[in-house]
Design a protein with these regions (language model features):
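An acidic-aromatic pocket/loop used at catalytic or ligand-binding sites
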Residues: 1-165
Length: 165
């Protein structure tokens, strides 16, 4: 399948500032804390060519052990947990997942026309409102937002890179 790439602001509602799509929800958006400068996950993301390679490099053994079980299909983007959903208006570029006995893993790569800080703040709001911790890291170019939740052992990590266009 191939087709033309639509203009970046094609889904932008009238009167909205370009790059702010997805910022309006029923939640009050909280500002994520400033990132720490230590970002080992940023290097892993930059050096990984696939979602499976990135999963294999995670420090969490449960996640890295499941990397080999990942299967690629766009349908995995529809199976993200409700507490860590796909960003509104996101354009999925790659999706993978595993749902076996010991592995419940989802990985999705997407792009959006929203500013990086808007996306970080939106996810920070979503995850902290549902009981996850949130640690924001950056190496100056790449950002990560990751955390865990005690009540169910859930974990997430987001790797974010600003677009150059």
């Amino acid at each position: 399948y191939s087709g033309g790439v639509p203009p970046t602001g094609i889904a932008q509602p009238p009167g909205r500032t370009p790059g702010s799509a997805g910022a309006s929800t029923s939640e009050t958006i909280k500002s994520a804390p400033a990132p720490s400068k230590d970002c080992p996950g940023c290097t892993a993301a930059r050096e990984s060519l696939t979602l499976g390679a990135l999963a294999a490099r995670q420090t969490n053994r449960r996640t890295s052990a499941c990397a080999g079980a990942l299967r690629y299909s766009a349908s995995w983007a529809d199976r993200l947990p409700a507490d860590v959903p796909l960003y509104p208006g996101a354009r999925v570029t790659e999706a993978a997942g595993a749902n076996t006995g010991a592995c419940a893993l989802r990985a999705v790569s997407f792009s959006t026309n929203a500013r990086l800080q808007t996306v970080v703040d939106w996810y920070y709001t979503r995850v902290t409102n549902t009981g996850f911790t949130a640690e924001h890291q950056s190496d100056g170019t790449q950002h990560t937002l990751g955390g865990t939740r005690d009540r169910d052992g859930g974990a997430y990590v987001l790797f974010l890179t600003p677009r150059r266009d």
